[in-house]
Regions:
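Short S/T/G/P-rich N-terminal loop/turn motif that feeds into the first structured element of a domain
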Residues: 2-260
Length: 260
């Protein structure tokens, strides 16, 4: 019990530096979501949400798909804001992941209708891209209220998307321990947390953490250091008690990605 209290106290002390650090690297107003206290669930008081899309590509068409998207993505971003577009290197093959920002569900519905009626988008991209794909998946997520969306400290580097499937019960059960686990890594310099998201649609009881590292080797080095940090180990130990499973993907930003 004494060890548990110490772990909780250490995790709590780490939250303040993480919040201060978030302020220094915050995105402009178009991408920034304000903190709303220490509630942990989706920011349902905020209408802004993020659509997380995953496309699986035919192995023989990956290069062609990326080339086509690089040339024609401007037709799509004319309708709504793209936050980032990544090519997955580890954790999946022939896969891209992208995040789109919407101010409301009605805005997204309007965008979808406009895109479907955009002849350039349909003929120059969609008709060519769809045959290159094997599947598409999406989720709607909110930033967790204690987190702001941040840019990487510099262009380049690698991005890691870690997705956690939590046990049923919701943020009221596991929210604070999950926050402590993430902020213990971020505040200690074991990675730069760019955003934490909680699914509203798609796989429920799922949260995602988007991280940035200088390169894959640096990420491996920092991970090893984190494993030897008693404060991080204590915070993670409490969080994993509520965890069913998790996956990780290491990604590189595409040339046209706003976040890179």
């Amino acid at each position: 019990m004494l060890n548990l209290r110490c772990a909780l106290r250490s995790a709590a002390l780490l939250r303040a530096p993480a919040a201060a650090a978030a302020q220094s690297g915050a995105l402009p107003s178009s991408g920034l979501q304000p903190c709303a206290g220490l509630a942990i669930g989706p920011q349902q008081k905020q209408s802004t949400f993020y659509e997380l899309r995953t496309y699986n590509i035919r192995p023989d068409q990956t290069a062609a798909f990326l080339k086509l998207t690089n040339e024609k993505i401007h037709l799509r971003t004319a309708h709504s804001e793209l936050l980032g577009f990544w090519n997955v290197e580890y954790g999946a093959m022939n896969q891209v992941f992208h995040i789109w920002k919407y101010d409301s569900y009605s805005q997204r519905a309007g965008v979808r209708a406009a895109v479907a009626q955009d002849p350039s988008w349909v003929s120059d991209f969609l008709s060519k891209a769809i045959p290159m794909l094997t599947s598409q998946d999406n989720a709607v997520a909110y930033l967790v209220p204690w987190c702001t969306l941040r840019r990487p400290p510099q262009e380049g580097g690698v991005f890691e998307l870690v997705s956690f499937r939590m046990r049923p019960g919701g943020p009221a059960v596991w929210g604070h321990s999950f926050q402590a686990a993430l902020t213990s890594h971020d505040a200690s310099g074991y990675g730069k947390l760019l955003g934490a998201f909680h699914n509203e649609y798609g796989q429920l009881n799922t949260v995602h953490a988007l991280w940035w590292f200088e390169n894959a080797d640096k990420r491996a080095e920092l991970r090893q250091k984190a494993h030897n940090d008693a404060r991080v180990v204590a915070a993670v130990r409490e969080s994993v008690a509520h965890l069913d499973s998790q996956t990780a993907r290491l990604m590189y930003a595409c040339p046209f990605s706003p976040m890179k």
